[in-house]
Design a protein with these regions (language model features):
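A cross-family phosphate/adenosyl-ligand binding-site feature
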Residues: 1-182
């Protein structure tokens, strides 16, 4: 990376539709952001296509290669922070078990190996949640294993697990303040 370029935000999207549009709003408020879109996230993006406006200069990396080639950018110190949001219970479980078989889980693994701090917004975090589905609001009941995996992930090095949109907003604001920029 050229010395004149500032490190960027990395933001990984998973297949969760829960808080998806709110996360897009947060992404639009950042400068210097790259999106990592897993295959499952690409399906969700298609549903929200009309709301998928990004800030100027944002780059999008899609899950198109077996080796998830864009993860090499973490070794080049291109990123100061990774945000994994919204994170499905499947993504959280894979992160906890060290499985990096898609773009989102791979960038999380590489961020950890490169000591890039991560903020993870785990969506399945309460015994009962309400979420918006194509047919309207539905109640979701995360399994005990989902709640346990979220707890386990919160013990990972350089990983800040947030449990609500307000906590995600606060974690991003804190990180921005620490970095002194966007």
């Amino acid at each position: 990376m050229a010395e004149s370029q500032s490190p960027r935000w990395g933001w990984a999207l998973t297949g969760s539709g829960h808080f998806f549009t709110e996360c897009l709003d947060l992404i639009r408020g950042l400068s210097g952001v790259d999106l990592f879109v897993s295959r499952a996230a690409a399906e969700v993006v298609r549903m929200y296509r009309n709301k998928f406006e990004l800030p100027q200069g944002a780059r999008i990396f899609r899950d198109t290669t077996a080796s998830a080639a864009p993860v090499g950018l973490f070794y080049e110190r291109v990123y100061h922070t990774l945000v994994l949001a919204p994170a499905t219970s499947n993504t959280v479980a894979k992160c906890v078990c060290g499985i990096s078989d898609n773009l989102a889980t791979n960038v999380f693994a590489q961020a950890g190996k490169c000591r890039v701090p991560s903020i993870v917004f785990a969506c399945d975090t309460a015994p009962e949640l309400e979420t918006m589905a194509p047919g309207g609001v539905v109640k979701v009941h995360p399994r005990r294993i989902d709640l346990e995996n979220t707890q386990r992930l919160s013990g990972f090095e350089a990983t800040h697990v947030v449990l609500s949109l307000a906590e995600l907003e606060s974690a991003i604001a804190d990180r921005r303040q620490l970095l002194g920029h966007g």
